Amino acid sequence: MEGNGCGGSGATPRGVVGMHWAPVVTSPPSPQPPFLPPAPCRPDVQMQQQGGLTCLKLGKRPCFWGGDGAGQVAQGSGGGGGGGGGGSADQGKRKEKAATAVPVVPRCQVEGCDITLQGVKEYHRRHKVCEVHAKAPRVVVHGTEQRFCQQCSRFHVLAEFDDAKKSCRRRLAGHNERRRRSNASEAMARGSAHPHGMPVLGHGFPPYGLPTSSAGALSLLSSARATGPWLMPTPDISARSSAALDELIAENRAALLSWQFFSDRQPPPAGRPTGRSPGSETAGGWHAHLQARPPPPGAGGQHEHQSGHVTLDLMQATTAAGGSGAPFRPVPARPAKEGGDAGCTSDAWTPSPMEGARVV
């Protein structure tokens, strides 16, 4: 046991390795400074340091704090001030240029026209065309013959105009379309505002079949319900109707007299009864007397027997009829006979023996 121990003075037995522990040589430790407690700092300096760490420099005024950052911030602010000074210098140069710039005087854009548009109307000055060339049928602008359009207020080529029109074809078509729409709307408005609900057709003209003049009030078939704006006023209807009635009676009498005049010239066949009253024979003799009278001088062939034309003085017939006071007397129509004209009423109206008309 003693030989196996680490200590002992005996020899090391065979087969056993001996281990010797040698001491490690190390450098002596360096002297460390003595630990000093931190110096007490003032609260204002500490707040400035914290503010410098959290400042994002987003405002116009830079953040100032103590230490090394203060110099950097001061340098940065100085550089910014230099930039601001450069901007103000540029603005000053711009103002000087604007003050020294010469105002451009507008001129007519037609080639060969150097008229300044300084004392003309604002319209010509704005569109850069003088008054003479604005109305000219053709001018040369940019090497092409053009014309100034009064509605577009600019130049067009001559192919866009119709004949000597001052406005282009496209603008004229739009203008005409707007006029047609306005006229149609006005006509519809007038028709809806009519007291009898009767629309006005054809751009203000009366409907087809009605007279277009004031003589429409003379119609005997017109009534107060059918009166429109184209007819006569109400106070004159009675007087006009009376005049129209007299005129119609005169025309009827003239037609009957002319028919009797030609029937007397061609006597009926032998054996055919005339069926006329004695008064009609008197009228026939009166017509024969008129035929025997020579035509007035200067009458020409119009009043000859060969011409077959008769001119009646309707006013004379109307006056004579009104003065005699003997109206026409209706006579029953003749019955239809074999070989004769069915429904022929030659004696439907027989004039009075005392009534007459002047045949010229």
Curated annotation (Swiss-Prot):
**Compositionally biased residues, Basic residues:** 172-182
Would the keyword Transferase turn up in this protein's UniProt record? Answer: no
Binding residues annotated for Zn(2+) 2, in chain numbering: 149, 152, 156, 168
Q: Name one GO cellular component term.
A: nucleus
A single Pfam family it belongs to is SBP
Native organism taxonomy: Eukaryota, Viridiplantae, Streptophyta, Embryophyta, Tracheophyta
Tissue localization of expression is: Expressed in young panicles.
> Per its UniProt record, what InterPro entries does this chain match?
SBP-like, SBP_dom, SBP_sf
Notes on the domains: The SBP-type zinc finger is required for the binding to DNA.
Q: Specify the protein name.
A: Squamosa promoter-binding-like protein 7
Q: Where in the cell is it found?
A: Nucleus
Provide the residue span(s) of the region labelled Disordered: 74-98, 172-196, 261-306, 320-360
Q: Record keywords: Cell wall biogenesis/degradation included?
A: no
Q: What keyword terms does UniProt attach to this protein? A: DNA-binding, Metal-binding, Nucleus, Transcription, Transcription regulation, Zinc, Zinc-finger
Q: Where is the composition biased (Gly residues)?
A: 74-89
Q: Where are the zinc fingers (SBP-type)?
A: 105-182
Positions with a binding annotation for Zn(2+) 1: 108, 113, 130, 133
Write one Gene Ontology MF term: DNA binding
Function of this protein? Trans-acting factor that binds specifically to the consensus nucleotide sequence 5'-TNCGTACAA-3'. May be involved in panicle development.
Q: Motif Bipartite nuclear localization signal: where?
A: 165-181
